[in-house]
Amino acid sequence: MMMTETVSLLSVPFGYGAGRHGSEMGPQAIFNAGLMRQLSELQIPVQDEGPLTVPQHYNSTHPRLKYFHEIIELNTNLAAKVSEIVARNSFPLVLGGDHSIAIGTYAGLAQHYKNLGVIWFDAHADLNTEDSSPSGNIHGMSLGVGLGRGPDLLTQIKGAGPNLKPENIVLIGTRQLDAGEKEYIRSSGIKCFTMHDIDRKGMSNVMDEAMSIVTRGTDGVHLSFDIDSLDPLEAPGTGTKIPGGVSYREAHFALELMYESRKITSAEFVEVNPSLDAGNKTARLTVELIASLLGQRIL
């Protein structure tokens, strides 16, 4: 399935879904860290779609959900753009922004894939609802929306939900779950590889199992990669740092295996926050990880 002839780079400079502002500067930081040069060295044809126009803050009010209407507007526009990219047989590579933009990414993909597999690389499960979320930040609900968990206006964005199926989803790198999320993961049958599982099985076995799950009966596989899946010592520039994450080599190895599978049909990299970074270290790492997904090798 992967790779199509062209990679379409879509920047989404949007950070209202996160608890701390700054991730809206992530796409530019990733570009500044040498993304185009890296892709050029890989001789990959790249179409730069430019930044998606993001809504201005207009004091939307919702009793529990922060920036609810801005997030609906943003993801409605993002879904249309992602759908357009897929329709041209190009590979959508979405650069966030916070993880609430995943709602628009898979909403656009769902207009072309009826049984989408999803690899959710993240310290968190992002399966909260307006009732279970301790913060009201929608970046912690983005996967849940795809499964039909959440307010109708979010789940009814064209293609947004409920369009994903629990049996087609794999969480990797998880290490902080709220009580409601634990319960939902157990009851729904979503496969979750926590850091404990990675320690016990090794990343190679985890990825073998993960790829087996997301390619079984699916017609496409989307990678949603939150940079906070890595250990904060490797990736300090992100808003919700949880110690004890995926190592530098584990992350690269996982992405190299995804490239070798030739099954990934779209990807997004989110939650790079340059205002919290150390010398653009996290943005540079993100460029390297994207390169591993797209075929960069040591030899």
Segments from the language model and where they lie:
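Catalytic cores of soluble, metal-dependent hydrolases
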Residues: 4-14, 20-93, 105, 111, ...
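Active-site histidine-anchored catalytic micro-motif
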Residues: 91-156, 261-262
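Short active-site oxyanion
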Residues: 90-92, 166-170
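Aromatic-lined glycan-binding groove of carbohydrate-active enzymes
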Residues: 166-168, 175-180, 217-221
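Solvent-exposed alpha-helices and their adjacent loops that cap or buttress functional pockets
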Residues: 2-3, 111-113, 135-137, 158-164, ...
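A general structural motif
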Residues: 150-154, 172-178, 205-206, 247-252
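Short, structured patches in soluble enzyme cores that scaffold and shape functional sites
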Residues: 120-123, 147, 168, 173-176, ...
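Active-site metal-binding loops of divalent metal-dependent hydrolases
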Residues: 14, 98-99, 123, 174-175, ...
